[in-house]
From Swiss-Prot:
Gene (name only): rpsK
Organism: Nitrosospira multiformis (strain ATCC 25196 / NCIMB 11849 / C 71)
InterPro entries attached to this UniProt entry: Ribosomal_uS11 (IPR001971), Ribosomal_uS11_bac-type (IPR019981), Ribosomal_uS11_CS (IPR018102), Ribosomal_uS11_sf (IPR036967)
Name of this chain's protein: Small ribosomal subunit protein uS11
Superkingdom per UniProt: Bacteria
GO process annotations (BP): translation
GO molecular function: rRNA binding; structural constituent of ribosome
Purpose of the protein: Located on the platform of the 30S subunit, it bridges several disparate RNA helices of the 16S rRNA. Forms part of the Shine-Dalgarno cleft in the 70S ribosome.
Subunit field text: Part of the 30S ribosomal subunit. Interacts with proteins S7 and S18. Binds to IF-3.
GO cellular component: ribonucleoprotein complex; ribosome
Length: 129
């Protein structure tokens, strides 16, 4: 029995002029997600996915490489303007924003959206080295 050939539709890339770059900088990793205005993800990259493993993931350079990768993928959608939202205390905060700026995006605003507890969960104990 021969199957009828199914037509393969080419995925149409939507053209988005402005987006939002969400930078989640934890102490162990940095995640950069570029979304449209509604919050639908266009591209994302992590410092672990950029080839860094272990303690090198948490460096500013790894965050810079991850932001460059996410930026290159977002430029295929026609993103020109970015609003940057930074979350977390990690070391890759500033370098990710600098990398997006150097990638040719016009950054309209930078906001810190780090969640601050109203005395919620107990924080992790201090490290003794």
């Amino acid at each position: 029995m021969v199957k009828a050939a199914t037509r393969v539709r080419k995925k149409v890339k939507k053209n988005v002029a402005e987006g939002i770059a969400h930078v989640h900088a934890s102490f162990n990793n940095t995640i950069v997600t570029i979304t449209d205005r509604q919050g639908n993800a266009l591209s994302w990259a992590t410092s672990g996915g950029a080839g860094f493993k272990g303690s090198r993931k948490s460096t500013p350079f790894a965050a810079q490489v991850a932001a460059e990768q996410a930026g290159r993928a977002a430029q295929e959608y026609g993103v020109k303007n970015l609003e940057v939202r930074i979350k977390g205390p990690g070391p890759g905060r500033e370098s990710a924003v600098r990398a997006l700026n150097a990638a040719g995006f016009k950054i309209t605003s930078i906001s810190d959206v780090t969640p601050v507890p109203h005395n919620g969960c107990r924080p992790p104990k201090k490290r003794r080295i």
